[in-house]
């Protein structure tokens, strides 16, 4: 990393420190124990913990986490393919035989095209023969899973945003701005210290309990939108990530809206 980038990171981090300290009085509470900052191992994200840094004090059994992003606010990048089981990965319910029966002919066709060295630009009507039927199979499977397990909406959001509470800190270099987003689903953030209550209240975020609607985005053949209760809305856009055909497609998952309780705090750079 060059010196200029290091300097940018320092300015970005410094702009957010005072706000994090204000929201977390226990970080600066007078105590004889050590305040420990620990970098998470890469494998933690696979297990549902998206925090990059964990800050803790052992003697009071307290910890908070930070997720650090640079110039992007991406949700998990997923795929649909002939072997990836999104149901098992997202909400711990393996995809049904009906799903695999629906998608197998599409992926078999794509595998043949790959073996022939075809390019995506050479696939006629790829929206109608690939994107639309795959998304229909995806929606049918999500609806099927929801009928079987009413906790599916909560499990899916936890897969996307993580199972632990944390602050997401996003550096926006071009805007000279650092954003802090609060994810306080389990009411572990923003606790008072022995002698201070934060001037900033970090609300508890309610996870979804109901799948309200799942349908194609109006005017689109490659994007579906999911509406959940408690203020959660997502979009799922399917697209090919390479020039040549593969039996695998990228699934771009984005939040269209989040609950009001997720605070979005702007920290301007000096």
Where are the regions that the model predicts?
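Short, positively charged
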Residues: 1-51, 56-270
């Amino acid at each position: 990393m060059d010196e200029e980038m290091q300097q940018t990171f320092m300015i970005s981090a410094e702009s957010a420190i005072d706000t994090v300290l204000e929201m977390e009085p226990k970080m600066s509470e007078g105590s004889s124990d050590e305040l420990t900052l620990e970098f998470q191992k890469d494998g933690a994200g696979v297990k549902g913990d998206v925090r990059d840094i964990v800050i803790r004090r052992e003697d009071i059994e307290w910890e908070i986490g930070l997720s650090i992003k640079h110039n992007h606010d991406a949700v998990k990048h997923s795929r649909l393919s002939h072997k990836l089981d999104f149901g098992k990965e997202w909400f711990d319910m393996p995809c049904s035989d009906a799903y695999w029966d629906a998608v197998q002919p599409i992926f078999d066709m794509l595998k043949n095209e790959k073996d022939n060295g075809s390019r995506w630009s050479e696939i006629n009507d790829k929206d109608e023969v690939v994107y639309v039927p795959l998304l229909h199979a995806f929606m049918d499977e999500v609806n099927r899973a929801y009928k079987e397990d009413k906790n599916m909406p909560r499990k899916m959001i936890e897969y996307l945003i993580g199972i632990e509470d944390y602050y997401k800190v996003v550096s926006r270099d071009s805007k000279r701005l650092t954003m802090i987003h609060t994810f306080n689903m389990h009411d572990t953030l923003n606790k008072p210290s022995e002698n201070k209550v934060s001037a900033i209240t970090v609300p508890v975020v309610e996870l979804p309990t109901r799948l309200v609607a799942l349908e194609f985005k109006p005017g689109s053949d490659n994007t579906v939108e999911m509406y959940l209760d408690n203020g959660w809305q997502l979009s799922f856009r399917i697209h090919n990530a390479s020039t040549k055909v593969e039996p695998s497609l990228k699934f771009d998952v984005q939040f269209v809206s989040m609950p009001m309780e997720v605070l979005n705090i702007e920290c301007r750079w000096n």
